[in-house]
């Protein structure tokens, strides 16, 4: 049986306050949001976690998502739940605030996160080799499908994913996420017209698990560029 998935947006980071930041960490407010998120997740899911092998945590290898994961899901890690980085869950654009740092510079600060399977292309998003991570409608929609396929194949019953608003909204599920809020989804039995996996949100998180997020859905791929406007086309030749 496919897992239930808990999709979490990272808490407030410095780029949410002022945009000119490279790979920004959480703000003090963001750390406070993690405390509220942790309390809610612990109350909601603690009894559902009997066997740590039935649970997994997947996290974008960005500093703000790693911090959010370790501050809000530490109680799962302490119970033996595995936590691993995955480049498919990174944010959409190639701006400095949405581009990560080399794993070698990040992993020492997060020793409990398994980074061994992070794509060797990380943090590249603009070279021809890294087209799968490009800021384009085609690449982001394909990445969203790939990310869901990977979750669907996993053996765990419950998977927490800490990711980013833009990717979750436009590439994966079509809903807005407030900083430090989450939504819970189950896989549908039937696939879409193009063979894509479909997920259905649980009613209890229609406004977010903390009640902070908008209820109106958004079309996947809405307003995403056909090509990354910040990348020189000649670089792909």
Can you describe what each PLM-predicted range is?
Residues 1-5, 93-112, 169-237:
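Acidic, low-complexity terminal tails and accessory targeting/binding regions
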Residues 2-84, 181:
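Active-site-proximal alpha-helix that buttresses catalytic centers in soluble enzyme cores
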Residues 15, 20-25, 72-145, 214-233:
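Phosphate-handling substructures
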Residues 42, 138-153:
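Helix-loop module immediately N-terminal to the HCX5R catalytic loop
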Residues 59-60, 142, 162-163:
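Short beta-strand scaffold positions
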Residues 5, 55, 157-163:
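Generic beta-sheet signal
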Residues 149, 165-170:
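Extended, basic/helix-rich recognition subdomains
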Residues 11, 164-165:
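Active-site metal-binding loops of divalent metal-dependent hydrolases
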């Amino acid at each position: 049986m496919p897992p239930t998935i808990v999709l979490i947006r990272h808490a407030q980071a410095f780029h949410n306050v002022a945009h000119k930041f490279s790979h920004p960490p959480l703000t003090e407010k963001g750390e406070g949001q993690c405390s509220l998120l942790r309390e809610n997740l612990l109350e909601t899911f603690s009894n559902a976690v009997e066997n740590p092998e039935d649970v997994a945590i997947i996290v974008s290898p960005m500093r703000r998502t790693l911090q959010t994961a370790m501050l809000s899901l530490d109680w799962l890690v302490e119970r033996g739940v595995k936590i691993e980085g995955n480049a498919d869950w990174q944010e959409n654009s190639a701006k400095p605030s949405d581009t990560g740092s080399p794993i070698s510079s990040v992993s020492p600060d997060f020793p409990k996160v398994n980074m061994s399977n992070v794509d060797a292309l990380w943090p590249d998003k603009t070279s021809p080799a890294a087209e799968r991570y490009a800021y384009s409608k085609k690449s982001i929609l394909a990445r969203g499908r790939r990310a869901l396929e990977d979750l669907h194949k996993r053996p765990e019953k419950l998977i927490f994913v800490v990711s980013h608003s833009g990717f979750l909204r436009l590439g994966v599920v079509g809903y807005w996420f407030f900083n430090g809020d989450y939504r819970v989804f189950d896989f549908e039995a039937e696939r879409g017209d193009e063979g894509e996996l479909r997920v259905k949100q649980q009613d209890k998180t229609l406004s977010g698990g903390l009640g902070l997020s908008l209820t109106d859905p958004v079309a996947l791929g809405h307003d995403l560029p056909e090509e990354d406007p910040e990348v020189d086309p000649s670089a792909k030749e």
